[in-house]
Amino acid sequence: MKYIGSFFKANSLSKEEIASQLLFLSKESVNHIVLESRCGISTNYKNLKENFKKDEISFFKNNTPLICIYKKAKPNIYSSKYSKTWDDTTFKKDIPVSSNALMTLSLLRLCSYYEKFKNINSALYKRAAFYKNLSKLQLEFYYTYLRNPEGFFVNKKNDESSSKSGLNISEKEDEMSYSDQALMMLAYYMYSKVAPEDSDSKTYEDFALQILNMFVNFKEELYSLSLDECCKIDSCLNNMLLYSNNEDCKLLVLDLSDFILNKYYESNSTFSNLETTSLLALNMYLSYKNTNILIFKDAYLDLIELFCNMFNDEKGIILKGTDKKEYKYSNMEICLYLTNLLMSFDLDEDSSDKRENIISKVYKNYIVNSGIVTSFPDAPNLDSHERYKKFSLKPDDLIDESMFRMTNANSPELTGLAPIFTKNLKYSTKKSIFTSDKTTFDSTKNMFIFFVFINSFIDKYIDFITDTPKEKKNAMLVEEIDSLKNVQKINKLPKLNNFNSKTPIVPPDAGESDFNSITNENQVDEISPPPTNPNLTREISEYSDSSIDKKEDLDDKMKNILDSTDL
């Protein structure tokens, strides 16, 4: 029986089905945005033929893949010669570093899924190679056009030129973000590991390690940044450690994770809102996975308990502070909150009906029924290998539609809207209803959410669909490690009514620069080669603290390094 009823179906979803639906939503949204939306600078078919094998691009002949993504747009879909493109008159042509790094990271993570279709489905399998090559084009573009004269990755904008020869990429007045440098570090490093067959992969790895060493050498100065910024940097370092097992990266993760945890406690939540606290929790999860140190596990589970206590089961809402007439939630804090609860079962083997109930209600109230998601992609067709365990196409292996979407959810074809998250959600305590924000696509928010969902859930889903036996438990070390070296005693978590927000510290300005026109509108026919400067491989350790005036701030030190190595 396929349709049981929306109310019963929503309340009967398992945590595995919810995680799978969030993954599928993210996977299909990224596919659509990158291949069809044209919400950014795209490469044309001629360029694809020059950089891709013929059989790799035959399935994408009508698409215009993005090599960079813009910040904002209306996600209304209309049919044209470019298939399901968006209305380009609504594009805000800022080019954020974070959105673009996260877009590339999402594509690279999806490669592991599509590679499973080798010798099963050539179209799906070739998507992996296509995404690798496209990711490389994107990274080449970032290296060439998204850096300022000092070498920092900075936000740019695509200024329309009166000349028909192309568009101008110019620098915005935004301040340089250290977390943006960390995101790019992760993107370049992940490419080197996902595409080891590429002769340039070692160059990309060396480039990423240069940025890592910059953070390692000047880690003390990182501690002057905001808690939110430190959490974002720590998240990138944790994910890089998962791929690299780099000892310097591990030591930095230990120091920075310990620092943000103590800073959170010492501040008595003065710095924290739900978004930052949820990102902190995710870092504690990753830090424990990477180091097996129990202090991080305990902190994570304490935060999970706090999240559970924040949920009002009677009203079905997340409480933020004392009673209010209206609660406002950002899309990122809702998704991080839900991700943490879903992942908590990895570290807490005891079944928790309370947590599963919260997950079900948060997903139903905040994601499905609130309107914060504009549409849900259709499940794969019954003749698709994606619908079957082990890709068998056998009726007994058919995967239920509930692993992909709610049966009563609106599809993009019905709404005319691409599947994205609107920015905010409000809950009226008087009317007991949710209202979503205006329908606008913000890539800085959406690409973050999509990457978090893909990165958090794709490995388990691959194990599920390939019917891989569960790995034995107790992979973690079991020795009791209650504290780290030089770690202060941890205080109890702050009470719920102490929650409030604080504006993050903004890093210093990185300067401006004018750039020449680079392309015809929405097309790039030529892209500069990948970073192959021999200075890239030079050891950065020579720029030690002893060689730099202690009074220099972090920004100046980083500029010296980047300028010297021509990053």
List each language-model region with its residue ranges.
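Glycan-recognition and catalytic cores of secretory/periplasmic carbohydrate-active enzymes
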Residues: 1-567
